[in-house]
């Protein structure tokens, strides 16, 4: 859109052991604002929070605006050079609440051709409340990176697990292998998933 303008401003502030960050701006015609803060406890435990919102227009009334809030609260253990462990609670204000989700499922049942086999995995956050856990093992024996992550919905019986293995061939060359596992019963956000399990391999070379 040639008539849209884009601008952003960011502020950083340190209050004793707290790091605070505020950002606001307009990107692709959408106003956005966000806040984040973090602190380190006992030189090992990182506690952090992120809150953000952006302008949205109703799909039923283009002139009606809303500002759904997304928030994340997390705690991570970073007291070891061998691994990091994180647990997070994510509330997705842009996701579907129970009534909206039920309406979407009815629409899929009544008009399956409209969805054309599309999968809910365009985003793992279709609903609103999630728990996230991740474990990272960097440079195991100076040759491997290993990461395991899990996302679980608190509103239906669905979960997503991701395991990634990287082999450090050299300073600029990495061979990666990723495995994604999906769990979702009928009526969950992953009911219309396109796969239950997926394996992907990739090569990365930096110049």
Language-model-detected regions and their locations in the chain:
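Extracellular/periplasmic loop regions
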Residues: 34-36, 46-138, 149-150, 190-192
């Amino acid at each position: 859109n040639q008539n849209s303008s884009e601008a952003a401003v960011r502020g950083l502030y340190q209050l004793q052991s707290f790091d605070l960050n505020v950002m606001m701006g307009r990107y692709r015609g959408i106003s956005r604002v966000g806040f984040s803060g973090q602190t380190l406890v006992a030189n090992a435990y990182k506690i952090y929070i992120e809150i953000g919102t952006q302008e949205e227009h109703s799909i039923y009334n283009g002139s009606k605006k809303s500002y759904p809030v997304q928030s994340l609260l997390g705690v991570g253990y970073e007291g070891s050079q061998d691994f990091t462990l994180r647990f997070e609670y994510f509330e997705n204000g842009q996701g579907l609440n129970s009534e909206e989700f039920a309406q979407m499922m009815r629409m899929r049942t009544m008009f399956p051709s409209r969805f054309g086999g599309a999968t809910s995995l365009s985003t793992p956050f279709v609903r609103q409340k999630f728990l996230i856990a991740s474990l990272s093992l960097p440079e195991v024996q100076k040759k491997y990176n290993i990461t395991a992550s899990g996302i679980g919905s608190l509103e239906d019986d669905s979960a997503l697990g991701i395991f990634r293995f990287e082999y450090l061939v050299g300073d600029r060359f990495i061979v990666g292998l990723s495995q994604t596992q999906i769990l979702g019963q009928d009526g969950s956000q992953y009911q219309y998933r396109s796969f239950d399990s997926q394996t992907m391999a990739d090569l990365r070379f930096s110049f």
